[in-house]
Amino acid sequence: MIDLRALEKDFDTIATRLQTKGVEEKVLAELKELFEEYKKEKTILQELQTKQNSLSKMFGQYKREGKDINELKNELEINKGKIAAHQEVVRDLEEKLKNIALTIPNPPDPDVPVGENEEDNVVLKTVLEPKGFDFEPKEHWELGEKLGWIDFERGVKLAKSRFSVLKKEAARLERALINFMLDHNKEYGFEEVCVPFMANSATLLGTGQLPKFEEDLFKICDEDLYMIPTAEVPLTNLYRDEIIKDLEDPIKLTAYTPCFRKEAGSGGRDVRGMIRQHQFDKVELVAITRPEESDKVFDEMVKCASSLLAKLGLPHRHVMLCTGDLGFSAAKTIDLEVWLPGQGKYREISSISNTRDFQARRAQIRFKDGKKNRLVHTLNGSSLAVGRTLIAIMENYQQKDGSIAIPKVLESYL
C-alpha cells in the first residue's frame, strides 16, 4: 500500500510518478480531495484535543484554588463531545483513504524509465549470443507434438484450453529443472520452503493481488481460499502481522509451486503452445530485508536467475521495465528474456522486482530496529518459470533430425 504519510508530505511528486504508471487523473483528484478533507478534519481534531488538555489543566487549577468550576465543567463536556464527533469523522475518512489506497499501485522508483508499455522498456545487457542454425528452427509446440512430449488435445479434454499434458522426456525434464533450480538457488543462500498451493484473502491482500485483481484468480467455491498465482504470495506472507526480532541478514526463501492464473487480461495472446497457461510450474525467490539492504539483494537476485540461464546455455537479456509496464506492487523490475529461435524473439522467463515497503505496509511485516519497529522491504522473482525454461531448451537445443539435446548440467538430474 502506498505510504499515506509520504503522500501527505509531498502529494504532487508522488501523484506525478503514479500517473506514469497509468493511474488515471480522476482517481488521483479523488484521492487528493479526500486527503485534503482528512488533513482538515485531523487538524480540527488536534486543535480540539489541545483545547481539551488546556481546559483540563485549568479545571484542576480552579479546583485547587476553590474557584467556580461549573462553567468550565460544561465547556469541557461540550468540547469532549466535539472531539468524539470529529474522531468518528477522521476514522471514517481514514477508512475511505485506506480503501482507495489499496487499489493504487506502488509508485515507481525515480530511476525507472518513463514509458507507456513494453515498447519503452530498456535493454540493459545481453548474456550469450543466440546461435545460428543450418536449418529452419521449429517452435516448441511443433517439436513437442512430433516427439510426443506435449499433448495439448488431452490437456483440453481434461480441463480446458491453456492446459497441457507433458509426457516422456518432457515430464522428466520438468522435474529435473525444478530440482536443478532449487539446488542452484540454495547456492545463492536461499532456503527452500514448501508452502500451501492455496491462500486466503488476507494473504492475497498482503502481496497486492486483492482487491484489484480478483478476476485473474481461481477462487475455491464457498471458501475464503484461492489457488495461488505465484509462490511470492505465501512466501512473503509467512511473516504477515509479525515483527522480526533479528533482521541483520536478509531472509532469503525459495519454493517450487504450481501457479494458477485465469489470464483474464491476456487478450487472446499466446493461445497456442505453453507460453501462457492457466497452470504452470515456477520456482520463486523471495527476500525480506532491511530498507538499506534491498538494492543490494535485488542485484543478487537478478544475478542468481541470470546465472541459472547461463548454466543452461540459454541466451538471454536483462530488460529494465518502464513505468507503464511495471506490475502493481513493483517499484522497480528487471525482466530476464530468453531467446526462442523458433519464434525468432526474446520472451520473458523471469521478473525480479523490488516492492520497497509497499507489500510490507499492506501485510504489516516489520522488524525491530533498536527501540523502533520499521517496515521491511520485500523482493520477489522467478528463478525460473519452469515451463518456459523447458520451451527454451526445446527450441535452443533442437537438432536437424528433430531430436532435442539435453544441457549437460541436467544430465545428473535425469
Curated annotation (Swiss-Prot):
Q: Which keywords appear in this protein's UniProt record, sorted alphabetically?
A: Aminoacyl-tRNA synthetase, ATP-binding, Cytoplasm, Ligase, Nucleotide-binding, Protein biosynthesis
Its cellular-component GO annotations read: cytoplasm
Localization recorded for this chain is: Cytoplasm
Q: Where does ATP bind?
A: R261, K262, E263, E348, I349, S350, S351
* Source domain of life: Bacteria
Presence of the UniProt keyword Ligase in the record:
yes
**PROSITE patterns, sorted:** AA_TRNA_LIGASE_II
Q: List positions binding L-serine.
A: T230, A231, E232, E284, S382
* Enzymatic class: ligase
Reaction it catalyzes? tRNA(Ser) + L-serine + ATP = L-seryl-tRNA(Ser) + AMP + diphosphate + H(+); tRNA(Sec) + L-serine + ATP = L-seryl-tRNA(Sec) + AMP + diphosphate + H(+)
Gene Ontology MF annotations = ATP binding; serine-tRNA ligase activity
Coiled-coil stretches noted in the UniProt entry, renumbered to this chain = none
GO biological process terms, alphabetically, are:
selenocysteine biosynthetic process; seryl-tRNA aminoacylation
What is the predominant subcellular site recorded for this chain? Answer: cytoplasm
The answer to whether keyword Ligase applies is yes
Q: What is its EC number?
A: 6.1.1.11
The metabolic or biological pathway listed in the UniProt record of this protein is: Aminoacyl-tRNA biosynthesis; selenocysteinyl-tRNA(Sec) biosynthesis; L-seryl-tRNA(Sec) from L-serine and tRNA(Sec): step 1/1
The UniProt entry's sequence similarity note says:
Belongs to the class-II aminoacyl-tRNA synthetase family. Type-1 seryl-tRNA synthetase subfamily.
List the NCBIfam families hit by this protein, alphabetically: serS
What's its job? Catalyzes the attachment of serine to tRNA(Ser). Is also able to aminoacylate tRNA(Sec) with serine, to form the misacylated tRNA L-seryl-tRNA(Sec), which will be further converted into selenocysteinyl-tRNA(Sec).
Q: What is known of its domains?
A: Consists of two distinct domains, a catalytic core and a N-terminal extension that is involved in tRNA binding.
The record's note on quaternary structure and interaction partners says: Homodimer. The tRNA molecule binds across the dimer.
Question: What protein name applies here?
Answer: Serine--tRNA ligase
Question: Which species is this UniProt entry from?
Answer: Nitratiruptor sp. (strain SB155-2)
What is the gene called?
A: serS
